[in-house]
Amino acid sequence: MSDYFEEVMRKLTIEDVSILGWLFQNEANAVFKAIKKSSIADELEYSTANFRKTLNKLEAIHFIGTVTGGKEHKLYLTEYGQQAVQQAIHHGEENEEVEEI
């Protein structure tokens, strides 16, 4: 299972990681902390098509969840999304240590 997760992580794009990182920094890590899609789109300034494509991918691999029922949909990091961000941070720290040596 961890091999599958590693493979999914390797295939993330810069846009994918940016959205995951933005949600992580803004602590959108639970349904009740979800943030409006429009707020995220305004902040990241991706094209509408690219933003939609990226969200669809992240939702399909269960890294983000969508809260519906209000006027506007909201997004949050799922447990898998949180693990992905934490793993990316960990790998970044390991790479920094290697560069220092």
Swiss-Prot record:
The keyword Signal does not apply. Gene3D superfamilies: Winged helix-like DNA-binding domain superfamily/Winged helix DNA-binding domain (1.10.10.10). Keywords: DNA-binding, Plasmid, Plasmid partition. GO terms for biological process: plasmid partitioning. GO terms for molecular function: DNA binding. It comes from the Bacteria. InterPro entries: WH-like_DNA-bd_sf, WH_DNA-bd_sf. Homodimer. Dimers bind to DNA, forming a protein-bound filament which may form a helix around the TubZ filament. A DNA-binding protein that is part of the type III plasmid partition system used to ensure correct segregation of the pBM400 plasmid. Binds the plasmid origin of replication, probably cooperatively, forming a ring or short helix with external DNA. Its effect on RNA expression has not been shown. This is DNA-binding protein TubR. It comes from Priestia megaterium (strain ATCC 12872 / QMB1551). The lineage of its organism: Bacteria, Bacillati, Bacillota, Bacilli, Bacillales.
